[in-house]
Curated annotation (Swiss-Prot):
PROSITE patterns associated with the record: UBIA (PS00943)
Associated pathway: Porphyrin-containing compound metabolism; heme O biosynthesis; heme O from protoheme: step 1/1
Note in the entry: Carbon 2 of the heme B porphyrin ring is defined according to the Fischer nomenclature.
EC number: 2.5.1.141
Protein's organism: Prochlorococcus marinus (strain NATL2A)
Protein name: Protoheme IX farnesyltransferase
C-alpha cells in the first residue's frame, strides 16, 4: 500500500493527461505560443462582466471590438510569458518541445508578434469601445507578464493568490465596455475570479508539482505538500461558493433564477473539494477538481447571461411572486 502511494505521488503527470484535447490537437508553432486554450475563459468572464451591467446587451460592433481586443491582448500576454519562461521550459521535459525552446520560432518573431497584438488590441478597444476598457486590458496584460510571471511566480508560494489579479481583470473590462464604468457587478465578478483562481490552479499544481520542483518554482504543493494545499483549496473553494451566491443581489434582473440554477454547480464544486481534502495524494481527484473548476467558471458566466434574457426575467418575477404568495399564506 505504501509503495503504490509513493508511485502515485512521484510519477510525473503531463498536461496532456489533464487536458485531453492536447493529445488530439497539435497546434502550429505561431498559435501554440499565444496559449489559445486560455483565451475562451477570459472572454467568457468578460461577457459575464457585461451581463452584470444595466446596459446589457451591448451593440454588436462594441461587443466584437471588446472580445477581439481582449483576445489579442491575451495572445500577447501568452507570447510574452513564453518569451520570459523559455529557459525554464527548456529545462523541463514536458515543455522542452515548445515553440521557443525547440527553436521552431525565434525570440524576435515572438516579440514582434506580441507587440503587434498589443497595438491592434489597444486600437480596437480605444476606437470601438472606450479608453477605460483599453486601459484595463493593458493593465491585465502587464500584471500577468510583470507581476505574476516575472516577479511573484519565482518568489512565493502565494504567487497565484496575488498574481490572480491578471485573470480577474476581464470582468472589469466587460463592465466598463458596457457602461463606461465598472460598477458593483463588475467588482463582484472580479472578486469571484480572484478567490476561484487559487483552488483552480493549485489543483493543477498538485498534478505538476514535480515539474515545478525540478526548476525551483515555489508553487504551494512543492513548498508545503499536498495536504496543506488541499486545505487551502478547501478554504478558497468555500469562499468561491459563498461569493458566487452574492451574484443574486448584484444582477440587475434575474437574480433568483441565477441562484437556483447555480446550486448544482456549487454542490459539485464542494463535493470535489471535499474529496480532494479527504485524500490529497489521489491525483485523479486533483485532476477532476481542476477540470470541473474550468467548467464551473464557464457555467457561472453562462448563467449570468441566461438570467438577463427577457424570458428568464419574466420567469424570475413569477418565482418571486409565487414565493410572496406562499409566504403570505403562512402569515
Amino acid at each position: 500500500m505504501v509503495s503504490s502511494t509513493s508511485e502515485l505521488i512521484t510519477q510525473p503527470v503531463n498536461r496532456e493527461e489533464v487536458v485531453p484535447s492536447r493529445k488530439r490537437i497539435k497546434l502550429p508553432a505561431w498559435l501554440e505560443v499565444v496559449k489559445p486554450r486560455l483565451i475562451p475563459l477570459l472572454l467568457a468572464t468578460t461577457v459575464g462582466g457585461m451581463a452584470l451591467s444595466e446596459e446589457w446587451p451591448l451593440p454588436s460592433p462594441r461587443l466584437a471590438c471588446t472580445l477581439g481586443g481582449g483576445a489579442l491582448a491575451a495572445a500577447a500576454a501568452g507570447a510574452l510569458n513564453c518569451l520570459w519562461e523559455q529557459d525554464l521550459d527548456k529545462r523541463m521535459k514536458r515543455t522542452s518541445n515548445r515553440a521557443l525552446p525547440s527553436g521552431r520560432l525565434s525570440q524576435s518573431s515572438v516579440f514582434i508578434g506580441a507587440v503587434a497584438c498589443t497595438l491592434v488590441s489597444s486600437a480596437l478597444l480605444v476606437s470601438g469601445v472606450n479608453c477605460l476598457a483599453a486601459g484595463l486590458t493593458l493593465l491585465g496584460l502587464c500584471s500577468y507578464v510583470l507581476l505574476y510571471t516575472a516577479f511573484l511566480k519565482p518568489r512565493t508560494s502565494q504567487n497565484i493568490v496575488f498574481g490572480g489579479v491578471a485573470g480577474a481583470i476581464p470582468p472589469l473590462v466587460g463592465a466598463s465596455a458596457a457602461a463606461g464604468h465598472i460598477g458593483l457587478g463588475g467588482w463582484w465578478l472580479f472578486s469571484l475570479v480572484m478567490v476561484w483562481t487559487p483552488a483552480h490552479f493549485w489543483a493543477l499544481a498538485i498534478l505538476l508539482k514535480e515539474d515545478y520542483r525540478s526548476v525551483g518554482i515555489p508553487m504551494l504543493p512543492t513548498v508545503s505538500g499536498p495536504f496543506v494545499t488541499a486545505k487551502a483549496i478547501s478554504v478558497y473553494g468555500y469562499l468561491t461558493v459563498f461569493l458566487s451566491f452574492l451574484g443574486c443581489f448584484v444582477l440587475p434582473e434575474g437574480g433568483l433564477l441565477y441562484g437556483i440554477l447555480l446550486l448544482p454547480y456549487n454542490s459539485r464544486l464542494l463535493q470535489l473539494v471535499s474529496r480532494l481534502r479527504d485524500n490529497p495524494e489521489d491525483l485523479d481527484r486533483a485532476k477532476g477538481l481542476f477540470r470541473w473548476s474550468i467548467l464551473y467558471m464557464f457555467g457561472v458566466c453562462f448563467l449570468l447571461v441566461i438570467s438577463r434574457l427577457q424570458v428568464s426575467i419574466v420567469f424570475n418575477d413569477q418565482l418571486i411572486a409565487l414565493i410572496k404568495d406562499f409566504s403570505t399564506g403562512f402569515s
